[in-house]
Every structure is written in C-alpha cells, then in structure tokens.
Amino acid sequence: MSERQSLAPAFLFDLDGTLIDSVYQHVVAWREALEQVGVSLAVWKIHRRIGMSGGLFVTALLRELGAALDEEAIVRLPGLHAEAYARHYPGVRPLPGSAELLATLSEREIPWAIATSGAERSAGPARELLGLPPDTPFVTRDLVRYAKPDPDLFLTAAERIHVDIRNAIVVGDSVWDLLAARRAGALGIGLLSGGYGREELLYAGAFRVYEDPADLRNHLDEVGVRRPL
C-alpha cells in the first residue's frame, strides 16, 4: 500500500439506515412484536430508539410508557421482532450509492467493515442484498457483549480490519451510532437516510452530515480520502 493510501482513514459502517433502507421495516416489526406482548406504542417513539441494543431499546420504551413486562415477555421480544422483520424484509433495498461507495473504498485499498446492533438472524441477509463477498468484515450484536451506544461493535470491527480506532471514521444514521463512535474514539459521519435530522446528528457529534451513501461517495475528499493520482 502506498504512503498516500496508508494515510487515508478506515471506514466502519452501520447497516440499517446507513447501507440498506430498512429502518422503517424495523420500526413496524418492533411495533408488531410489542403488540404481541400487550404493549401499544406510536411508531415515532419506536423510531427514536432504532439503532440501540435490543435490551436498552426495550428498557427505554417501557420507561417512557411507565409500563412493566414480565421476564417471559422480555425474553420473547427479540424473537418476535426477528420474525416480524423477516416478513417485511422483502421490501428492503440497498440505499442509493451503498454498493458503489464500498466498491470505491475497496478500489482505493481503504479498509472498511460493517458493525450493526442487529443480530446475525436479521442482519445476515444484507450481505447478499449488498453483494458482499463472504470474507467481508461483518460484526453483529451476537459477537460483542454490549451493542450501541456502547463502543464494542466499532472497536471489534476496527480490530477485524487491523486499524487503530483513532484512524477510523464511523458512518451511521442515528444518534446512537455517533455516541458509540465518540465513546470508541473515532470520528463520526452522519447520514440522513435513517430519518434523523441534520441538526440532531450534528448535535450528537457528527463531523459531517450527508444525505446518503451516494452523497458521501461524492464528498470523500472532505473526510480525507483523496482521488487516485
């Protein structure tokens, strides 16, 4: 690798709302799962928590409701959500420019990985959707002790591609991605493709905010990725 390439940052990508257009399928899936255990909740409140670990997600929502669930219902929720998401998954598509962005980074020999709060059961099919090779560094909730907003996912992803987290850029669509990036010691980039507003992402610590992967690809120079000579 050339000196120029070695100076470029590595990239750690969130998945849902960052590379694939799946946030609202997750929102509806969580609503259906919650309804099956007797909890009715407005979808906008669910959306605000997408991207958190499942455990924190449930804890936060129940606190807002002032409700309680028995242990059996709490244990059932992840499976109910996964089943509901699988029903809605046929409507999921790659976000504009996601495959092209990853291909550009690979062509320029810039390391990248994917780190998602989703479990392998729900996140795994995205590999095929994005056309990823089998050896793509792909870290799911199953592989770490704590998911976002804890930094474990991004720290593990950085280890997978043998880069210092301080020389990595986290790309995500939610405030939870950006909080995890800050806690990990990485620079955060926000995307609007998951439904959060520009000001929210900037307030959460984003260095830059772009519309979607295509927009980021068109502005890679702004985050230290130079064009080939």
Stretches with model-predicted labels:
Residues 91, 113, 119-170, 175-184, ...:
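Substrate-recognition "cap/lid" segment bordering the active-site pocket of phosphatases
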Residues 4-6, 107-110, 161-167, 223-227:
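Glycine-rich phosphate-binding loop signature in dinucleotide/nucleotide-binding domains
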Residues 2-47:
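Active-site neighborhood of HAD-like aspartate-dependent phosphohydrolases
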Residues 40, 62-100:
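Metal-dependent phosphoesterase signature
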Residues 33-34, 53-69, 126, 157-158:
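Helix-loop "lid/cap" segments that line or gate small-molecule binding pockets
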Residues 7, 86-114, 120, 124, ...:
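Short, acidic loop-to-helix structural element flanking the phosphoryl-transfer center
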Residues 208-212:
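Short acidic-hydrophobic, aromatic-tinged amphipathic segments that line or gate anion-handling sites
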